Amino acid sequence: ENNRRVFAYLLKRGIDRKVIEACIRAGILYESADYHNAVFVGKDETGTARYAFLRGTYTRGNPFKAEVSGSDKRFCFCLPPKRESKKLAIYEAAIEPLAHLTLEGTTDKWRLSLGGIYAPEEGTQTSRDMKKPIALDAFLARHPEIEEIEICTNNDFAGRWAADHIEKAYQGKYRMVRNLPEKEGCDYADLTKER
């Protein structure tokens, strides 16, 4: 019922009020009653909540971040488009689709959080391929109409490494577009804070 702290936190992060309101109306964002965390909800085709990510709204110290126990990564947080779309943008974290939507202002594509990525530490040599993200594979299985995947991972070593591997894994079947934030070391949520 009361999402005041989530509103204040996301507005402070530069997220557009209309984006926040739309997410709350859709039931994919709310404020937890106990600790006032922002709760990003992933739903299945029937509208049943299957995934939740908690993000602390207090801005001092290290922020609290955790997936809710029992969350199913096949149904990570996702912003739907206004109309049918054959485009999908993918992000590392739940706040990033909101931030990128705020910056772009377009609702012409699905915006899916992968619920994090795996990448080796910078400087370590690895020829091992990245496992395909569960959230992405499951989304594509449910949405055979998708033709384009826009990779919007962070512009840091891990994000670029993941982008390379995701592009390699899905090219040929999908049109791949790389759209990392222009600023080195940033994600889209960092860019909305700077506006």
Regions found by a protein language model. Name each.
Residues C23, C76-C78, C152, C186:
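Generic recognition of cysteine residues
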Residues E1-A38, T46:
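TOPRIM metal-binding catalytic domain and adjacent DNA-binding surface shared by DnaG-type primases
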Residues A8, L98-A99, K168:
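Surface-exposed charge patches
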Residues K86, T102-R195:
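TOPRIM fold recognition
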Residues A33-R142:
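Phosphate-handling DNA/RNA-contact segment within nucleic-acid enzymes
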